[in-house]
Amino acid sequence: VELCERVLSEMTRLRERVPEVSGSVACTVDGLQIAGDLPGDRCDQTAALSAAVLALSRRMADLAGKGVLQETLVSASAGFAALYAAGPTIVLTVVAEPGANLGLLRLEGRKTAAALAAIASRQR
């Protein structure tokens, strides 16, 4: 429970810093949800898909010879989904509305991912 509460606290801070964020999910690299605030049953589905997208994105970065993956951004007609590796064990997915300041989203998303990685490392 403590891990979930600490992760949710960081995700709440992200929403406060980036008003266009409409929700987020943190999950393990295996796709198991840790915490989330997306509507309906989207958290579990998003967690499972996020793990797969992260794995594919890491592979693409490696194949392209471009170093370690920092983020994956999905740009859609009604907004954005950004995925961040939060250390070796956690994936953070952030959903944002159209018109979101992508520079701010990327900056704050990375900060939140780093905070989640630190939380996870203290749990071991």
Identify the function of each model-found stretch.
Residues 1-21, 29-124:
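Acidic, low-complexity cytosolic segments
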